[in-house]
């Protein structure tokens, strides 16, 4: 799952990005949330129901300062709807390898640390999916990632911080 903007670029660079992300199995998500992200969540559910895996970054964007920000609840919703476990992954070193604005990654190493699965009971009706339950599961994911990565956790959405920084 990747931001929809990767699939909407113009010119040769835009076409290349769309081709690249599509060829490696990335599908677009409208990160503005709510009903606008439903087609991506539907696609993700279909992948999980086939017994396959996919990745989702709960922050929804790159961290503006290397800290770990509040997660969005899409992964929790998918887990509740499908009963699939969530495997938290801390990815370390990407900030140094490809700082924002660089086109070609620098040489270096990244590390992926896999956490213990978070098992969620599948629910049978939308009434069982409460905001509180979604937040509880999402917070468990971000706590696990923070523990593995050593990142400071910020209880605020990264996009909100980015917007404030650009004012």
Give, region by region, the residue ranges found by the protein language model:
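Catalytic core of membrane glycerolipid acyltransferases/transacylases, capturing the structured
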Residues: 1-34
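Non-catalytic C-terminal accessory region of glycerolipid acyltransferases
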Residues: 38-167
């Amino acid at each position: 799952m990747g931001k929809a903007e990767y699939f909407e670029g113009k010119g040769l660079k835009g076409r290349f990005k769309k081709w690249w992300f599509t060829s490696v199995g990335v599908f677009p998500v409208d990160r503005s949330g709510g009903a606008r992200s439903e087609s991506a969540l539907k696609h993700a559910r279909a992948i999980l129901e086939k017994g396959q895996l996919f990745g989702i970054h709960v922050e929804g964007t790159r961290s503006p300062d290397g800290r770990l920000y509040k997660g969005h609840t899409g992964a929790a919703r998918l887990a509740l709807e499908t009963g699939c476990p969530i495997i938290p992954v801390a990815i370390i070193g990407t900030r140094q390898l490809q700082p924002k604005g660089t086109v070609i990654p620098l040489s270096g190493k990244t590390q992926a640390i896999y956490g213990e699965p978070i098992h969620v009971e599948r629910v049978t009706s939308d009434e069982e999916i409460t905001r509180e339950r979604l937040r509880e599961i999402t917070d468990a994911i971000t706590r696990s990632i923070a523990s593995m990565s050593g990142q400071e956790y910020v209880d605020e959405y990264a996009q909100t911080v980015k917007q404030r920084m650009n004012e």
